[in-house]
Curated annotation (Swiss-Prot):
UniProt keywords, alphabetically: Cytoplasm, Heme biosynthesis, Iron, Lyase, Metal-binding, Porphyrin biosynthesis
A Pfam family hit: Ferrochelatase
Subcellular location: Cytoplasm
UniProt keyword annotation of Transport present: no
Pathways per UniProt: Porphyrin-containing compound metabolism; protoheme biosynthesis; protoheme from protoporphyrin-IX: step 1/1
Family of this protein: Belongs to the ferrochelatase family.
Catalytic activity: heme b + 2 H(+) = protoporphyrin IX + Fe(2+)
InterPro entries in the cross-refs: Ferrochelatase, Ferrochelatase_AS, Ferrochelatase_C, Ferrochelatase_N
Name of the protein described by the UniProt record: Ferrochelatase
Domain of life: Bacteria
TM segment ranges: none
């Protein structure tokens, strides 16, 4: 009987190779060319992307990356590597590789390493707690594209999401309790998720429901009154309506309601990145304090916390 060989592929979004306009432009060109991310007809989108968006946004975004860049690369890459190393250490007899949907390390390189080790049973773990067509489904598309020319395919177990997994909720709860112990209980705990266009949800993407499921499970775990926690959406892009309420507009309005002390977390991000460290911890903090807020504390992502690695290990299962 054929001996099966298991392997694990961890996948996150990706990152530029450097905080420079040129590197950011290459990354954004790949990212924003994915139809799962932007589904505007190509004849309209290509001139807009290459003629306006990339020339204007690349230098701006490069400056933002410069403000959070770490010695080993972008925060997302550095932390993803730590997560990869920690999970691999838990599973010494199972190949574990990290790939990115856009940029390096690529899905192709990660798959090549796994297949070269004779993997016949592949567990694919997109590092997105809440399913969305623009993230999780893009991993599926990328995986299929990379395997299209292979004569021999591994059996694949694809983890769609883990929005309500008990170990995920327990890890989030622990993060919140740590923050409350350090900074006191806030007037509001804000749960900010990356947004998507409303149209995507209307067309069947159940991302809003998955975000709500996480929020409701966390409310129950913390035992806080529902009015103590609010859910918002960040990082909107383009002109069409995105999921609301918007995080930045919420930050602007809360102090006028007498809410002067907030703590904010972004449970949709498995690793801290530009959207959490710069957009939330810097931009939204400034908005809140300028509007009259008095205390703003960002609760870090789960990153390589041991409780997070416990979760990842449970998700991929015992595959030795």
């Amino acid at each position: 009987m054929k001996q099966e060989k298991y392997g694990v592929l961890m996948v996150n979004l990706g990152t530029p190779d450097a905080p420079t306009p040129q590197a950011v432009r290459r990354y954004l060109a790949e990212f924003l060319s994915d139809r799962r991310v932007v589904d505007t007809p190509r004849l309209l989108w290509w001139p807009l992307l290459r003629g306006i968006i990339l020339p204007i946004r690349s230098p701006r975004v490069a400056k933002l990356y410069q403000s959070v860049w770490m010695e080993g690369g972008s925060p997302l890459l550095v932390i993803s590597r730590r997560q990869h190393q920690a999970l691999a250490a838990r599973m010494p007899d199972t190949p574990v590789e990290l790939g990115m949907s856009y940029g390096s390390p690529s899905l192709r390189s990660a798959l090549d390493k796994l297949l070269a080790q004779g993997v016949t049973q592949l567990v694919v773990l997109p590092m997105y707690p809440q399913y969305s067509c623009s993230t999780t489904a893009a991993v599926w598309d990328g995986l299929a594209a990379q395997l299209r020319d292979n004569r021999q395919l591994p059996a694949i177990r694809f983890i769609r999401d883990y929005a309500e997994h008990p170990a995920y909720i327990a890890a989030l709860k622990h993060r919140v309790e740590q923050s409350f112990a350090e900074h006191g209980e806030p007037d509001r705990l804000v749960i900010s998720y990356h947004g998507i266009p409303v149209r995507y949800a209307n067309e069947g993407d159940d991302y809003p429901q998955r975000c709500r499921a996480t929020t409701e499970a966390l409310i129950a775990a913390l035992g806080l009154p529902e009015g103590k926690i609010m859910m918002t959406f960040q990082s909107r892009f383009g002109r069409e309506p995105w999921l609301t309420p918007y995080t930045d507009e919420t930050m602007q309005g809360l102090p006028a309601q007498g809410i002067k002390h907030i703590q904010i977390m972004c449970p949709g991000f498995a690793a801290d990145c530009l959207e959490t460290l710069e957009e939330i911890q810097e931009q939204n903090r400034e908005i809140f304090l300028h509007a009259g807020g008095e205390a703003f504390h960002y609760i870090p992502a789960l990153n390589d916390d041991p409780l997070h690695i416990d979760l990842l290990e449970q998700l991929v299962g015992k595959v030795e």
